[in-house]
Amino acid sequence: MTYQNFLAPMAFALSLTVAGAASTQTLTMGVRGGPESIDPHFSALGPHAEAAKHIFDTLVWSGIDLQIEPGLATSWKPVDDDTWEFKLRKGVKFHDGSDFNAEDVKFSIERIPVVTGPTTTAIYVRRVASVDIIDPHTIHIHTDGQAATLPNDFIRLFIVSSEAAADFSTLETASAGFNSGAAAIGTGPYKYVSWEPKGDLVLERFDGYWRGMGDWEKVIRKEIPNDSSRLAALKAGQVDVINYVSSVDYLALAKDTNIDSVKGDSVYIMNLQLDQRENTPLVRALDGSDLDENPFRDLRVRQAIDHAIDRETMVDIVLEGLGKPANQMMPPGFFGSSEKIPMPEYNPAKSKKLLADAGYSEGFEVDLYCTGDRLPGDAAICQGLGQMLTQVGIRTNVNAISKTVYFPAQARLDYSMFMNGWGTLTGEASYTLGGLAHSNNPEVKLGAYNRIEYENSDVDRLLQTGARMMDATARRATYEEAMEKVMEDKAYISIVQLQTVWGAKAGMLQFTPRFDEDTLAFFMKSAR
């Protein structure tokens, strides 16, 4: 076995031909979010990894439909129950002219747990016990038992230069070393020039890139969080392409002959998450007094919330059609998604009865938190949820805040009810269920993103069993069963699968939208 595709075939492969007024040598991109640091190991958030892919390569590459493909590793295979062998690409150069080899892979794997931030990247190497260098282009990775999905995890294993980053591999030194450019030496298609946090990331083409030269000598990634401002910049010619066109602007943009737009399915599912602790901080009676217990620990309350959500309205009205109703935490066809899970019924009368049966006939009040600047429609979905829940008696105060505030607070377990998007970037369930639905257990390195203290011993058992199954058919069935149990518990309530729109100057570019929503300059070709 060399590499394996865990995805069912994906139908869409839309190609966008878009052209414009910018220089054929410079591409200016308007993006909703940017990196939190130039250190690729700091954050697992999508915008951070998207920016990192311009400078650094991953050991295994994730294709357009999230199929795994050779990257800096050309092939991989299990050699025994707890060892994988990876063959490394020869002739690859870092931006400083030094050779890429096995030392850099070993260094990067061992560095990640040391320097990761609160949105941890350690999940990508959680199964690694040790790394042996066999020769400059062969490594053996020893795991803590059978690890069938290790190559999938490595689509986010960014490789840094062991020499350039040697002095910048502690929490205290990492960001400064990379942000200054001293350690920002990758093998990717572009070289680091400068970065202004929350502003411009300026890149220069690396002519020695192993995939070949890109079309653009210079790339400027402008971080423009506001959707209207980003679109205005495109219309004014200040940028050549933008991501995350809002649902409000999409229909009008489609009629604009000066701008080309394309829509693609997204890997991201919006999930409502309900705190399962005995005492939760942001729930109270309608008169402001404390409740005797956390209502979200009662399954009837969680079911009531699920039945209060009108997913069709959320897609058709709130998102202007840019989405699909979701019934589980991964898109259909992904490895471990289950066809047995029904789409939840919108039934507000049933919601009210369930609340009354649980002892909350008068309802209660809760603060709902979400991001307002990360994924398309996040704030609008959050507002829609607030209205729907309030209508059945759960008075909901919506707080759509910056992702830079939201995620650290989520990691501190500050919230009682919160919503954010989760993308199954590896295309298979161990990533999503292992991160979110397993109890938070550092000993087995699962549940790192379980911020609600959800725990189901059957789910834990299934996920631990599935993680060690090399037989794909048996593993799929195990993950499907785990998904069914998680969605039945309703501590996680999936709402919609997003769809994403890009806009660009008419006739300037050719590119195919990616399922993970990444906007990557190297794969945007000049149409001229």
Language-model-derived ranges and their functions:
Residues 64, 77, 89-120, 130-132, ...:
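Extracytoplasmic/periplasmic ligand-capture domains
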Residues 30-80, 110, 183-189:
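N-terminal lobe/hinge region of extracytoplasmic solute-binding protein
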Residues 84-87, 137-143, 201:
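A generic structural motif
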